[in-house]
Each structure stands twice: as structure tokens, then as C-alpha cells.
Amino acid sequence: MGIKHYKPTSPGIRQMTRHTFEELTSTRPEKSLLERLTRKAGRNVYGRITVRHRGGGHKRMYRIIDFKRNEFDGIPAKVVSIEYDPNRTCRIAKVVYANGAKRYILHPVGLNVGDTVVSGPDADIKVGNALPLENIPVGTIVHNIELYPGRGGQLVRSAGASAQIMAKEGRYALLRLPSGEQRKVLLACRATVGQVGNLEHENIVIGKAGRKRHLGFRPAVRGVVMNPVDHPHGGGEGRSPIGMPSPVTPWGKPTLGYKTRKPNKKSDRLIVSRRKK
């Protein structure tokens, strides 16, 4: 995998960088693992915007990813291709099990076409293998971590992400997450060995607004240039200050450092140390 730079033939191209996609081995996805993806544009079932700055973008099909890795325990699966997924930052690997079943999994660093992966409690500590945290040694790098046994991986799934098992105590394993947060996770939860691939993703420069629109993002407008009806910072004659001691959100809550986490959240007891600021 690498990054492609361009000659500055236009202002948009000047700083722009792209992936070379040299690690991909297949351009056509597996039809049996595709689903229609309906665009929501940030709206809920009532048609109201619940996530701002979403909409448009290229049409996509959803690739069904096996986040659980518990369907074929002990059955080896061969990696047959590494593919692009428009719905996530990392690449995906198509694996074919010995019984003929096909699945997509997240592609970790070091997993190549022709390699074999296994899931289950007796799997080896090898990149791409998925097993319960109780069977993974302390110090191992993992990704695609479950929060509840059997629910499927929910943590550490984006490009280049990894967590490390720091300790085990009682029913829990202590993990250091990419944010720096140290959190307890049940030992019965599964994780996949290795680091998520596509390490160069963080070095990609979008370069121009049109590329961002192509990805499905709409412009973010500053509150200070809105009208008073649209934002607390809005209004005034010409270029005016926000007119209040500290910035607030469009709904009037303080921002820039204001803590929004619920003070008595259930999972607080599982967080040993919060993320680094």
C-alpha cells in the first residue's frame, strides 16, 4: 500500500493525495455478500436531521462483514482476495471456509492471499485468527473486540487501529484502546489478533471540497454566519462576535471542552483511566 502524489496542476490537486490500491487483488465483490444500502442523509424515521453534514455521495452496496467470527469454529478458512469497501476506512478480506462458506472479514496488517485463518477457543495466536480474550496472552495486539459475548466486534475496527491486552483479572481483561483509554472487557468476549490494515489512511489529504461531497459529506457552516433563528452565535451587523462568554452548540449547550458524558453511566465502572486529552 502506498500514497500517490500529484503535480500541482490546479489548486484542488496541489495538496491532494490518494491511495495507490496496490494491495487490492479483486475489483468485483462477492454478490452473495452484498446488500442494498439505502441512503438516510442523516435523517431518522420521522425525516428529521439527527446527524448534520450528511447527504449525497456515490451510490454504494453494503458488504456483509462477519464481525462475530463464531459460526465455523475450528474450520480453517483460506484468504482468496483483498478488496475495497466504500463503507469503511480499512480493506476487507474474502475468506472461503473448508466447508465452502464465504465470508468477509476486516483485513489486518500482514494477512495475505493464500493465508489461512481460524476462529474458536483453540485457534493459534496468529494474525487474523479470532478467539476469546481469555485465550490470548497479555501484551498481544488485537482488533475487532466484542463488548458483549456473541454480539460481534464493536471496538477497534477502523484503518490502522489496534488495542493491547494489558492485564487479566477475575472475569475481565484490561485493554488499552487507540484513544489511550484503559477499559475492562469480559474475558469471554472475542477479539481478532493483529492490527487493522490500511495504515496509510491517516496520511490521505482530501484536497478539495468535491472529493468530500463524493464521500457523502455536506458542508459545515459556522454558527456566527447564520441568522439568530438558526444558531445562538447568529445575527449582528456585518462581522460580529458571538456575543456570549463561551461558544455553544446550535442547541445552546457549552462546547469546546464541556463534558457531555452522563455522570452515572453504567460502563464507568469498567473504565480504569479515561482517554488522553
Swiss-Prot record:
One of its GO terms (molecular function) is rRNA binding. Keywords: Ribonucleoprotein, Ribosomal protein, RNA-binding, rRNA-binding. One of its GO terms (cellular component) is large ribosomal subunit. GO terms for biological process: cytoplasmic translation. It holds the Pfam family Ribosomal_L2. Residues 226-277 are annotated as: Disordered. Part of the 50S ribosomal subunit. Forms a bridge to the 30S subunit in the 70S ribosome. One of the primary rRNA binding proteins. Required for association of the 30S and 50S subunits to form the 70S ribosome, for tRNA binding and peptide bond formation. It has been suggested to have peptidyltransferase activity; this is somewhat controversial. Makes several contacts with the 16S rRNA in the 70S ribosome. Belongs to the universal ribosomal protein uL2 family. PANTHER family: LARGE RIBOSOMAL SUBUNIT PROTEIN UL2M, RIBOSOMAL PROTEIN L2. This is Large ribosomal subunit protein uL2.
